[in-house]
Amino acid sequence: MRHRARKTLTALAAAIGLAGIGVSALAQPTATGGPEVMPYAVEDFPHSLQVMSWNMCGPQRSSYHCEGTGTPEDKANVVTTQVAVNRVEAVLLQEVCEDDLTLLMTKLGPGWSKAFDNYQWLNNDGTRKNSRCGEDTGRADRIGTAIVVKGQIIDARTYPTTQPTAGQQTPFHCATASNWDVRLCTVHATRVGANPNNPTQDFRGQQFTEIKTIVDTFPKTVFGGDFNSRSPDDPKNPAPGVWPVGLYSTGPSTPGYQECDQNGSSRTGRPTHTTAATGTTPAIEAKIDYIFSNQTRNWCTVTPTSKSDHSIIIESVTISG
């Protein structure tokens, strides 16, 4: 049953923040990339879990090209707005600065938990250093990925995946949301060109296969993030073979995991990332962010925001008993 958007309740939910939210306000679209209309009221799915995935584009280091995407306060407010309006209860973050994560947790309050793991840079001599949020003379807090959950998390751990022999190292880590007994994992796959010694080297196929092997062991799971790959049925994908058989399903009751924005058997979806235009090239939009689950999908939203070059994805799933 579809519900009409209730503007008064939405405004109230946004105004009062997180404490005492007792309304099922439906999100309203805004010109600045605010919450997209939620297609169902959450009361329709009493055993649901709303999971948000977002590459925050949080670094202040120029190599990440995140200039002009807002302040740490702005980015934290994007998350808390989705919590208040779309009833998000778990968040999978990429490119989040550690101090900004602390700010977000303060805003969310004591009823929330987090798991964080940082990116590292692997030098040619085998030594490692933590990736900084700022330039070498700027912010020194670490940058990485995070899992944020309403309630307690248990068994937070990082799983080994194949990484470049030099250059940026990105973790794959998971944690169990105890309120739902579901395993949540955040992904930031290695982009092509991450190894400065071999810019054509591609680790995505190995990483996706390893991720599939790991999540296949979880009875109930939701995993998502920035996969740095177009979807396998996207005709513009130059390397669809990086997606292993049995990861991305071809529809209900087929092997693999249904993706949040998947429609029928087509393994595609709305764009989630925009590469800015230059003087010689136009802007490029592509779907490279995903949420997968082995639980029943209720609804999915994909919402662009001016606070990152990545859209916000939210999936509501019904958690099996």
Spans of features found by a protein language model:
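Active-site beta-strand/loop signature of hydrolases that rely on acidic residues for catalysis
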Residues: 50-56, 79-105, 148, 175, ...
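Sequence contexts marking disulfide-bonded cysteines in secreted/extracellular proteins
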Residues: 56-58, 65-67, 98, 132-134, ...
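Active-site-proximal beta-strand elements of phosphoester/diester hydrolases
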Residues: 46-65, 157-159, 174, 181-191
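N-terminal, active-site-proximal structural segment of metallo-dependent hydrolase catalytic domains
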Residues: 2-13, 19-108, 121-124, 321
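Active-site-proximal segments of metal-dependent phosphoesterases and phosphodiesterases across multiple
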Residues: 189-210, 231-249
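Metal-dependent phosphoester-hydrolase catalytic domains
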Residues: 34-36, 40, 215-222, 229-321
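Structured beta-strand-rich core segments of catalytic domains in phosphoester-bond hydrolases
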Residues: 34, 41-43, 96-181, 189, ...
